[in-house]
Design a protein with these regions (language model features):
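N-terminal membrane-sensor/transducer module of prokaryotic signaling receptors
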Residues: 4-203
Length: 203
């Protein structure tokens, strides 16, 4: 049945992701290596940015780890605010935006917390919502909770990196085969979330 097929597919995906991680951890270079190294570097930069902000008193640790998602009224798909959203809007674009130029296949790169909440997306995906939810889904992807398998996998992974393959809903009924590579973000030893990069599968 469908449930069994989905479980088997999920198991197969998990096994392939483990194999990819083990291969990369041995130092073998692959087509994915530049993307893996880029997200690991970015995750480290974000960790340092967050820790520096805490040290300066720009944000409190309780606010940075806020997990209360206040719905933004009249948004479809639903958007949410936290006590750290305004802070990440100030500091994350400087890390995220340049990485869009890493390779023509890169579609997005953004930090998510451990629940898949994406506060600050790339500028091109952070348009104000309009009246069309289909357009919003494609163009207003900031302040959203991404709780699908890929989103939560990236958010909760604590290994050095996680490489996943999935079909991304691009809006307007179109999908694209994508790879999602992520690396965990730690703040003073606490797992804050992960840094994700999505790029198109070659061919």
């Amino acid at each position: 049945n469908i449930d069994n097929a989905q479980r088997q597919l999920s198991g197969l995906l998990g096994a392939s992701e483990t194999l990819i991680r083990l291969t990369a951890s041995t130092g073998v270079q692959s087509a994915d290596t530049p993307f893996i190294e880029a997200v690991q570097t970015a995750a480290g930069k974000i960790s340092a940015l967050f820790e520096s902000a805490l040290a300066r008193g720009d944000i409190s640790e309780s606010d940075l780890f806020d997990r209360t998602y206040a719905p933004v009224p009249n948004t479809d798909p639903p958007q949410h605010m936290t006590r750290f959203t305004a802070f990440t809007d100030r500091v994350l674009p400087a890390v995220q935006e340049p990485l869009l130029q890493l390779d023509p296949r890169v579609v997005f790169c953004a930090a998510v917390d451990t629940n898949g909440y994406l506060p600050t997306h790339n500028l091109k995906f952070s348009q104000p919502q309009g009246s069309d939810p289909v357009w919003n889904a494609a163009n207003s992807r900031n302040r959203r909770l991404f709780t699908d398998r890929t989103g939560l996998g990236a958010a909760r992974n604590t290994e050095a990196f996680l490489l996943q393959t999935y079909r991304r809903d691009m809006g307007n009924g179109t999908f694209a085969m994508m790879k999602d590579v992520s690396a965990p973000i730690y703040v003073k030893g606490r797992h804050w979330g992960g840094f994700r990069m999505g790029y198109k599968v070659a061919g």
